Amino acid sequence: MLVKENRLTKRKEFGYIYKKGRSVYSKHLMLVYVPTKLKNIRVGFSVSKKVGKAHTRNLIKRRLRAIIQDLLKQNLIKTNNYIFVANSSITELSFEELKSQVLYVLNKDGLINE
């Protein structure tokens, strides 16, 4: 579970990031991010009802949270506010494939610490 300091929870925060943020796309995932002055990395997840029933959407969010939590422990992500948005095709991916998609979108705009 992500600690409270690393979670985006408020609708207003999501709206601000969608409005002001930059987008990075892959086949199954979209990343929207905006730089922040805070020292904490904050992450939110959005999985539309087009993806499937609630248990499928929750599975995707749990997997994404686990991947991000692992990256945060390794200090691999630069300090920004992030929203990961899942496409409907994401249900076809295994955990390892999903992890590679997350790393791909983060690398695409240089958001991984070396």
Regions found by a protein language model. Give the residues of each.
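Positively charged, solvent-exposed patches that mediate nucleic-acid binding
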Residues: 1-114
